[in-house]
């Protein structure tokens, strides 16, 4: 009887040891998985940053991937022109040349027929429209209506996009816009760690899905578009986009869900901001602003507006100014961010 009890005790101890070892192994494995959330309002550039991560840290995009987005490029290009033509009516802007009315009718007919092929005839009409002084004036006032940021890029490149042998480039892919619905994820290995980067739709209707991604997060990259300080939300055509972004940042930065995680802020689209700030004052969004109307001073002010929302004296906000379509810029910024996250993760594991 005593012999059996002793044997059972030894077996129990061995089992406990194996369980403890497995728990330690699982904990070690979980510490080597870094979960990053990309958060921000709609059209801030989250999906473009995720594409850049795939280019920089995965195998990028294959020739087949590029060819598959050709219809998206055509659709983005046609709908960019459509947005301008509709705005011309609402803003009561006349075409520089009367013949452009016929060209605009072709664009409307194409979209109405659900045929978003960039035919030779349509491309020629769109090129004539894009060079029309009235259309250009309407585009200059693009902050007064809803239009994709990539509009100028695609319309400037119409001759290339409409060529018979056109294959989208990596830059074309970065510029395409498809509304993010649900959750998109990229996994990559770096310096012995697995990074799991998650992008969830930023428009108001999509934010209820964010809660499903909040467990075991190591860092948040919050992305805000600098160039949207004088634009309104696509969802309501009323709320200022920058003010919406600040409100969203406030709620996330100070949420108890994220009290102990690293917080990174990307002030994105600095290239578009540089073009816009020379003609549209920052006081449109911030009437109290008294500084100079130049890129550096205005960006610093916007950064300060975000940073002052952080109510935790223990938390540092790591801020970077980015252009999500510039791979070199994104690589430089991501390298700095990922190195910081890795160093802090190693410290939490007691390895440095």
From Swiss-Prot:
Binding site for GTP: 40-47, 174-180, 199-203, 268-271, 324
Binding-site positions, Mg(2+): 47, 180
Coiled-coil stretches noted in the UniProt entry, renumbered to this chain: none
Gene3D superfamilies xrefs: GI Alpha 1, domain 2-like (1.10.400.10), P-loop containing nucleotide triphosphate hydrolases (3.40.50.300)
G5 motif: annotated segments: 322-327
Domain of life per record: Eukaryota
Keyword tags: GTP-binding, Lipoprotein, Magnesium, Metal-binding, Myristate, Nucleotide-binding, Palmitate, Transducer
Region (G4 motif): 264-271
GO biological process, any: adenylate cyclase-modulating G protein-coupled receptor signaling pathway
Gene Ontology CC annotations of this record: cytoplasm; cytosol; heterotrimeric G-protein complex; nucleus
Biological role: Guanine nucleotide-binding proteins (G proteins) are involved as modulators or transducers in various transmembrane signaling systems.
Assembly, per entry: G proteins are composed of 3 units; alpha, beta and gamma. The alpha chain contains the guanine nucleotide binding site.
Record protein name field: Guanine nucleotide-binding protein alpha-7 subunit
Provenance organism: Caenorhabditis elegans
